[in-house]
Amino acid sequence: MFELRKLPYDTNAFGDFLSAETFSYHHGKHHNTYVTNLNNLIKYTEFASKDLVSIIKSSSGGVFNNAAQVYNHDFYFDCIKPITGCGCGGSCQSMDANLQAALEKEFGSLENFKAEFIKGATGVFGSGWFWLVYNTKNQKLEFVGTSNAATPITEDKVPLLVVDVWEHAYYVDHRNARPAYLEKFYAHINWEFVAKAYEWALKEGMGSVSFYANELHPVK
């Protein structure tokens, strides 16, 4: 059985990006519901003893939707962090040199990467996610937009960064202003986490996805 992961930060520390109320609903209710639903759906089935990634890759329907949403939310919550009290609005965050070089090689510049990321995430129709992934087939970084519960790990693409563009992720604080939410999201990206995900993607490929998920949800 799976458990709701704990968040690695104070949910009151995000200023006008995300309120504690948003975390209370997003993590405490939405995310928790996916965990609860998944446990109820897999009880007494062949999925009961499987790890999260294996369930995602071998299921469909309700089991897939809830398992994928557990993973998607786990990853999203690790992709953000509070800004330190330096007054820079997140602009002084240092980026790992290898990650920066890879982004500049693929997207031309960090400025262009940001512009394309926000444009792509703004353009996701309806509910979904916008990802930066490492494609294990061509060894390139690329953007992927997914709808509803869909996740790029089913296509052997390793997530490095994701933003949740379901309205429940931002409506309390930003109403229908998705672009404003995305600007704030970008300022709160946990680049250390993204760099580590990239490092392990290069070393282990899709194995890094299972390692990440199993650390949060060890098979019992």
Swiss-Prot record:
Its cofactor is Fe cation. Its EC number is 1.15.1.1. It holds the Pfam family Sod_Fe_C. The keyword Iron applies. It catalyses: 2 superoxide + 2 H(+) = H2O2 + O2. One of its GO terms (molecular function) is superoxide dismutase activity. Binds 1 Fe cation per subunit. SUPFAM superfamilies: Fe,Mn superoxide dismutase (SOD), C-terminal domain, Fe,Mn superoxide dismutase (SOD), N-terminal domain. The keyword Transcription does not apply. Keywords: Iron, Metal-binding, Oxidoreductase. It comes from the Bacteria. Fe cation binds at residues 26, 73, 164, 168. Gene3D superfamilies: Fe,Mn superoxide dismutase (SOD) domain, Iron/manganese superoxide dismutase, C-terminal domain. Homodimer. Destroys superoxide anion radicals which are normally produced within the cells and which are toxic to biological systems. Belongs to the iron/manganese superoxide dismutase family. PANTHER family: SUPEROXIDE DISMUTASE (PTHR42769), SUPEROXIDE DISMUTASE [FE] 2, CHLOROPLASTIC (PTHR42769:SF3). This is Superoxide dismutase [Fe]. It comes from Campylobacter coli. The gene is sodB.
